[in-house]
Amino acid sequence: MDLPGPIHDFLLVFLGSGLIVGGLGVVLLTNPIFSAFSLGLVLVCISLFFSLSNSYFVAAAQLLIYVGAINVLILFAVMFMNGSEYSKDLTLWTVGDGITSLVCTSIFISLITTILDTSWYGIIWTTKSNQIIEQDLIGNSQQIGIHLSTDFFLPFELISIILLVSLIGAIAVARQ
């Protein structure tokens, strides 16, 4: 989207805060249905980030696949789960939780420090002139297909193998 600078910056901050609030909701809410709705908020904010960066195809795919299918599947799985058997084994705090929270807090502080120290306006976000001419001739979905079949072929195939193994594992767990 070609928006003026202040509006674009406001939308970035608004969507970023939506991501943070949704992520905290996924982790901190005790009701799993509310956590799934918070995950939906996170996925919608990510999709809107893609549309702000002029990747409309990826934004639509994000909405259709992750929000429309995966999040609904998670909601159905959570609703069919028996929550009473999981709440019996609840311990409030362990030593591993303290170590994990310490590590996560230190990573979070280092990320915030890096983000605040970076000069974002010094980064050149434009492309070269020959890339602009090449991108105008090919559509967005064609560019994704070309990159998936050339530059990102090996990672794409590795991700498909990982998804296949996780699907086989989920079927094996469901049969038991």
Swiss-Prot record:
Query: Which keywords does the record carry?
Result: Chloroplast, Membrane, NAD, NADP, Plastid, Plastoquinone, Quinone, Thylakoid, Translocase, Transmembrane, Transmembrane helix, Transport
Which GO CC terms are listed, alphabetically?
chloroplast thylakoid membrane
Q: What GO molecular-function term can you cite, just one? A: quinone binding
**Family affiliation:** Belongs to the complex I subunit 6 family.
Class of this enzyme = translocase
Q: Which InterPro entries match?
A: NAD(P)H-Q_Oxidoreduct_6, NADH_UbQ/plastoQ_OxRdtase_su6, Nuo/plastoQ_OxRdtase_6_NuoJ
- State whether it acts alone or in a complex, and with which partners, per the record: NDH is composed of at least 16 different subunits, 5 of which are encoded in the nucleus.
Query: Which cell locations does it reside in?
Result: Plastid, Chloroplast thylakoid membrane
Catalytic activity from the UniProt record: a plastoquinone + NADH + (n+1) H(+)(in) = a plastoquinol + NAD(+) + n H(+)(out); a plastoquinone + NADPH + (n+1) H(+)(in) = a plastoquinol + NADP(+) + n H(+)(out)
Task: Provide the protein name.
Answer: NAD(P)H-quinone oxidoreductase subunit 6, chloroplastic
Functionally, this protein is described as follows:
NDH shuttles electrons from NAD(P)H:plastoquinone, via FMN and iron-sulfur (Fe-S) centers, to quinones in the photosynthetic chain and possibly in a chloroplast respiratory chain. The immediate electron acceptor for the enzyme in this species is believed to be plastoquinone. Couples the redox reaction to proton translocation, and thus conserves the redox energy in a proton gradient.
TM stretches of this protein: 10-30, 32-52, 61-81, 92-112, 152-172
Which organism is this entry from?
Answer: Oenothera argillicola
For this protein, what is the EC number?
7.1.1.-
Glycoprotein as UniProt keyword: no
Which PANTHER family is this protein grouped with?
A: NAD(P)H-QUINONE OXIDOREDUCTASE SUBUNIT 6, CHLOROPLASTIC
Keyword Chloroplast among record annotations:
yes
Membrane topology listed for this record: Multi-pass membrane protein
